[in-house]
């Protein structure tokens, strides 16, 4: 209802796509501006899909999961470039929390940390938000 109201009031057509479990680029449609919120949630979904039994996680599988997530983000970027649009990726920063002891959380932290770094390195701009204050990193 809020989206409909906003579309009518502002003359801007936008919507929220939730529950993206694979092929996020395919969900973009013709939207020129995309906010990909919760890269961390998407990473968790990919981890669960590619390694349902965390005891089977290997360094090789971890790298494969990282490549899959990064490829999905790059596919989204390519689609946005085709539309001459912009994309914002929102994610969690894993380096400021207490080091986990749970094997799944350890793998998640390593994977998301690597993915975040790769995405940030290839982005035009990078911001960090703490206590509601944004800091431009790049």
Could you tell me what each predicted segment is?
Residues 17-18, 35-37, 89-90, 129:
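Short, conserved beta-strand edge motifs with alternating hydrophobic and charged residues
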Residues 21, 32-54:
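A basic- and aromatic-enriched beta-loop-alpha substructure that forms the phosphate/nucleotide-
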Residues 1-29:
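Conserved P-loop
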Residues 12-14, 32, 85, 124:
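A structural micro-motif
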